[in-house]
Amino acid sequence: TYDGTPFLFARHLARLRQSAERIALTLPFSDDEVLGRVSATIGAADLPGEAYVRILLTRGVGDIMYDPRACPSPTLIIIVKPFVPPPDETYQRGVKISLVSVVRNHPEALNPRIKSNNLLNNALAMQEAHKHGAFEALMLNYRGEISECAQSNFFIVRDGEVLTAPLEAGILPGITRGLVFELGEQLHLPVRETTLRYADLPLADEAFLTSTTREIAPVVMVDDLTIGTGRPGPVTTRLLWAFRGSRVEIEGSRIEA
């Protein structure tokens, strides 16, 4: 939340519905009903600051078997806890990430576009990254292309262009990722999708991560490779400040902003 309001709630909920539809799961509540339940949970938590909100949709109670029809009544779970943002040095100095051996899920096995509760692929990647002392795990897809990070989308900046892998590379359509395209238009910065490979990293002037909880975080190292000058770059900084300047005004309604 920002100022107690769920950030881009409608976009998050739309992605939840789309993900559920991909696995033949129905969210049996309207957007207003879900927002009401989220707001009530935030109120009941009575937190002193901002809240981290997680909405889970399960198939509900039923027999232990592989047939989803055994669980006909979905269960909605809303988790609210205090939000602890990354430390200021994340943005002032940037972070190190690690290219891990764990490959992102094949889209024809478990499509990464589905925002699901099955995070084993991501967790294994983060395990390996932590062994390397890294903030995040950078993952390749089954074709050996850069896809995304375990908990974030990934961008590079090269020759004034902001580049990120296409959805077809097998990535999650991140909410903040999408917002970067909008901010790029506002700032007259070209932002586009393109195939990225490890060989593109030494040529990058800057790199950054995006996620709802991390906002836009500069990446200054990938393992032992220094990105650009080794410090947060001007394009990343412009995008971060544009994000922070507009985050409570986006689309002009409390549900969206």
Question: Model-predicted segments: where are they?
Answer:
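Secondary-structure junction motif
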Residues: T176-R177
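Conserved alpha/beta cores of soluble small-molecule-handling proteins
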Residues: T1-L138, Y142-E145, L172, E182-A257
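Glycine- and Gly-Pro-enriched alpha-helical subdomains that act as flexible
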Residues: L138, E145-L167, L172-P173
